[in-house]
Regions:
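Sec-exported extracytoplasmic/periplasmic mature domains
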Residues: 87-88, 128, 132, 140, ...
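Active-site segments of SGNH/GDSL-like serine hydrolases
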Residues: 138-145, 168-201
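Amphipathic, non-transmembrane alpha-helical secondary structure
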Residues: 120-128, 159-166, 170, 251, ...
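N-terminal secretory targeting modules
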Residues: 1-63, 67-76, 80-93, 128-131, ...
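Catalytic His-Asp segment of secreted/periplasmic serine-dependent ester chemistry enzymes
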Residues: 184-266
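Conserved SGNH/GDSL esterase-like catalytic core that processes O-acyl groups on lipids
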Residues: 55-62, 67-163
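Charged, glycine-enriched surface loops/patches
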Residues: 153-182, 205-215
C-alpha cells in the first residue's frame, strides 16, 4: 500500500506520509494503553490474592467462673495468655473474657447462690453475641459445691450440669463456633475429701460429654496433676487457697488451649 501511495504527486505523497505517521502514533498509544491496563489488572489480581492470603482474626470467648475471670493476685489469667501466645505465633485474635466469679452453669432461678446472673442467664450476651470462632467452657466448681456439707445436694445437680453444658455446645455449634471443654480444676488438700469426691463426678461427666459431643477437651485434673507431681509445693503450690489456680495454673491452661487452636487453625 505504501508503494502505491508514493507513486502519486508530491502533495499526495506528503498527505500519505502524514496518514501513515498518525496511524503509527495511534498504534503506539494503543500499545501503551494495553500495557497500562495489563499492569493495573496485575496489581488488582496481586492485591486480591494478598488479601485472600491474610489470616482471619479469630474471636475467642472464655466462658466460665472465677477460675476464668480476672482475679486479684493473678498477673495474667489464661484469657490474656491465650491472646499473647497466639499473637506471637502470628495468628490475629481477639479474646473476650466472659468469666464471672461464683458462676454455675444454670440460672439464678435454679440456684441463687449468689444472686447474680449465672451461665444460662448470660450465655446469649456473654458468648453468642460475639459470634465466636472458639469458646472455652470452664464450669463445675460451683455446680458441684455442697453448701450444707457432706452428703447434701450440689448447687446444680449433675444431670442438670450435663444438660446445661450440652445446651451451650449445641448453640455454639449452630453458630459455627468450636468448643473446648475444660474439666473443673482439682482441689488441693485444704478442701474436705467429700468435696473432692463430688467434684470428681462432675469432672468425669465433662470428659464423657466431650467425647459424645465430639468437641475438644482439656482435662485440668490431668494437667495439674502432672505438674504437681514434678514440682515442689504440689497442688497447694498451684492453688494456695485450695480452689483457685495462681499464675502457674493459668499458664498451664493457656498452653493447652493455644496448642489446640494452633493445631486446628492450620
Amino acid at each position: 500500500m505504501e508503494e502505491l501511495l508514493f507513486r502519486h504527486s508530491p502533495e499526495k505523497q506528503i498527505i500519505a506520509k502524514l496518514i501513515l505517521s498518525k496511524a503509527s502514533i495511534m498504534r503506539t498509544k494503543y500499545m501503551h494503553f494495553l500495557s497500562s491496563v495489563s499492569t493495573v489488572l496485575l496489581i488488582v489480581l496481586l492485591s486480591t490474592f494478598s488479601s485472600a492470603q491474610e489470616k482471619k482474626e479469630l474471636t475467642i470467648v472464655t466462658f466460665g467462673n472465677s477460675t476464668t475471670a480476672p482475679r486479684k493476685g493473678i498477673e495474667k489469667v489464661y484469657a490474656v495468655r491465650i491472646h499473647e501466645a497466639l499473637t506471637e505465633a502470628g495468628i490475629p485474635n481477639k479474646v473476650i473474657n466472659s468469666g464471672v466469679g461464683s458462676n454455675h452453669t444454670g440460672s439464678v432461678k435454679d440456684n441463687d447462690r449468689p444472686k447474680i446472673e449465672h451461665g444460662m442467664d448470660r450465655f446469649e450476651k456473654a458468648v453468642l453475641s460475639h459470634h465466636p470462632d472458639w469458646v472455652t467452657l470452664n464450669f463445675g466448681l460451683n455446680d458441684a459445691y455442697q453448701d450444707k456439707g457432706d452428703g447434701t445436694a450440689s448447687r446444680i445437680p449433675l444431670e442438670a450440669f450435663i444438660a446445661n453444658l450440652t445446651h451451650f455446645i449445641t448453640e455454639i455449634k449452630k453458630n459455627n463456633g468450636r468448643v473446648i471443654l475444660l474439666t473443673p480444676n482439682p482441689l488441693s488438700s485444704k478442701l474436705e475429701p467429700f468435696r473432692h469426691e463430688r467434684l470428681k463426678l462432675y469432672k468425669d461427666a465433662v470428659i464423657k460429654l466431650a467425647k459424645s459431643e465430639h468437641v475438644e477437651l482439656i482435662n485440668s485434673w490431668k494437667v495439674f496433676g502432672k505438674y504437681a507431681r514434678k514440682n515442689p509445693g504440689g497442688m497447694e503450690g498451684l492453688m494456695p487457697d485450695g480452689l483457685h489456680p495462681m499464675d502457674t495454673g493459668h499458664k498451664l491452661i493457656a498452653d493447652e488451649i493455644v496448642k489446640i487452636i494452633k493445631k486446628r487453625n492450620r
